[in-house]
Amino acid sequence: MKYILVTGGVISGVGKGVIASSFGTLLKSCQLDVTSIKIDPYINIDAGTFSPYEHGEVYVLDDGAEVDLDLGNYERFLDITLHRDNNITTGKIYKLVIEKERTGEYLGKTVQVVPHITDAIQEWVERVAQTPVQGSSKPQVCIIELGGTIGDIEGMPFVEAFRQFQFRVKRENFCVAHVSLVPLPKATGEPKTKPTQSSVRELRGCGLSPDLIVCRSEKPIGLEVKEKISNFCHVGPDQVICIHDLNSIYHVPLLMEQNGVIEYLNERLQLNIDMSKRTKCLQHWRDLARRTETVRREVSIAIVGKYTKFADSYASVVKALQHAALAANRKLVLVFIESCQLEQETLVSEPSKYHKEWQRLCDSDGILVPGGFGSRGMEGKIRACRWARENQKPMLGICLGLQAAVIEFARNKLGLKDANTTEIDPQTGNALVIDMPEHHTGQLGGTMRLGKRTTVFSEGCTSIIRQLYGNPKSIEERHRHRYEVNPKYVPQLEEHGMRFVATDVDKTRMEIIELRDHPYFVATQYHPEYLSRPLKPSPPFLGLILASVDRLPQYIQRGCRLSPRQLSDASSDEEETYVGATKLMKSLQITGTTTPTNGISRNACRSSNSSTISTVSSDIEGACGGVGVGPTTTNGHGEDIGKE
């Protein structure tokens, strides 16, 4: 087993997660099985109760573990399935050691940080490194990311553990990559290497010497700066890797390859890589990176959320949208809308902000209502669901988004004006969303319905979402929720047009809803974003993107296969315009008329649909129409339909 430890210096958030994932991507391209471990030196047992504003999203694994969002990077980059033990926290280690002490395993010894805590860390790493993460084969390389920065007091037991670990596994099996910031002050315009020198000095003072120094900078670093770091940090010039800010994280593995990382690791860790037998993995990454640069036609998606001030709160949602947009050959434009800004209270207190946010929502091509907890902003989510339903706007709801859609439908279609969730109003007369029996109110951590669960489609179901998945009988997706749709109201909801197209295996929990006579109004109780991959986008997200650019019907007609041109990284606006014009001319020749029988331009459709704004309830009517632009008049495409 080979180990690569990735540490950080100067500041946190310097990009260790992406660097660690890129190491794994490069090694996988050499046909090596790779696993990852993330170490978080906080005392929490897991990330389940973290505030999204402080740590970003909580990522959920197959086994129900609530972990740091960096594990999502590992799974997406490497296309592997990690487990709860792949995330180590100080809390887990101390809990393990204390439990051993209580059961007498230390035979009366004084339990100390060294050796008991450090030994527990090393044993945990060795055990988890052997756990298969892709199929049944054991990994050959383990990438370990140590969270925080070198010198943090909470991380010192882990640094000491790895100081010992390098001798435990021998030098040829252990490598340290140190990621450090090289700032570029505007006053001088010159890269400063002193922070990196100090960081490396501190790392060496702890007993670890970096084999690779990965310099993060705003702009590319010149050879002179690279040689200076090499000289003062006692490493060879080929051991200094410069990663500047890039347009896409998909470029990072490619840049590291150009810097000779594979060759260095092959020699340093004695990997015996046969360069002639490398897989096409990196070619896929090259295509993906190139496509991010060449795609020009945009699709705008409004994320109506509760934590939009911190983008990492929706990290997996954003990644899933990016995967789907690239697959559909579109450039993603995200429109973050704080759901509380869509509520009546904002209209009274800040009318200009209220109208502005509603206008941004109306101008978007599609809407996504993600998950969340608590009452704040819930009414805004419900209003967004209503607008999407009444105005035929493509929408995807996730978790709380499904619950908001059900409550809105019950209020405005069933006439149950007090419909609500017991999370917000425990005394409501019409509890459309109720607490699950598994939820223990005395404890928050680990009490939700978590992890991968089976979702079964209804017999004879021909729904859009089922077709997007390939018409299976069932699917498996990851869950994270404490509340569910009240099954008592399902018959009433279905009678008025809301279809519950999938349930859990016991047919008691509603998992997916769709609306009849709507281009794309889908909501899931599970979180499809967790299983989206760059080369395998999540079906619900792909459906949202395609519906938002009027391509979903064609995609379904093709058997849910993207056209070669959509999968190409060389598509352009001119090419699509040419293809559309060619097909238009053919239709003219066939019909013998001056206008194709179905040749209604999208702009014409917009004009005819601009009146739909009047269907919005009176309290939000002026928000979308008051500034003179209808909800579907400016969605950023501006071209006639060229059906594929």
From Swiss-Prot:
Write down the top EC class of this protein: ligase
Q: Which InterPro entries match?
A: Class_I_gatase-like, CTP_synthase, CTP_synthase_N, GATASE, GATase1_CTP_Synthase, P-loop_NTPase
**Tell me, what does this protein do in biology?**
Catalyzes the ATP-dependent amination of UTP to CTP with either L-glutamine or ammonia as the source of nitrogen. Constitutes the rate-limiting enzyme in the synthesis of cytosine nucleotides.
Q: Which organism is it from?
A: Drosophila pseudoobscura pseudoobscura (Fruit fly)
Gene3D superfamilies, per this entry? 3.40.50.880, P-loop containing nucleotide triphosphate hydrolases
Q: What does it catalyze?
A: UTP + L-glutamine + ATP + H2O = CTP + L-glutamate + ADP + phosphate + 2 H(+)
PROSITE patterns named among the record's database cross-references: GATASE_TYPE_1
Biological pathway: Pyrimidine metabolism; CTP biosynthesis via de novo pathway; CTP from UDP: step 2/2
Q: Cite the Pfam families for this sequence.
A: CTP_synth_N, GATase
Residue ranges annotated for the Glutamine amidotransferase type-1 domain, each copy included: 300-551
Q: Which residues form the active site?
A: C399 (for gatase activity), H527 (for gatase activity), E529 (for gatase activity)
UniProt keywords (A-Z) are: ATP-binding, Glutamine amidotransferase, Ligase, Nucleotide-binding, Pyrimidine biosynthesis
Name recorded for this polypeptide: CTP synthase
Question: EC?
Answer: 6.3.4.2
GO molecular function list: ATP binding; CTP synthase activity; identical protein binding
The entry sums up its family as follows:
Belongs to the CTP synthase family.
Q: Which SUPFAM superfamilies does the annotation name?
A: Class I glutamine amidotransferase-like (SSF52317), P-loop containing nucleoside triphosphate hydrolases (SSF52540)
Q: Name one GO cellular component term.
A: cytoophidium
Any GO BP: pyrimidine nucleobase biosynthetic process
Q: What CDD domains does the record tag this protein with? A: CTPS_N (cd03113), GATase1_CTP_Synthase (cd01746)
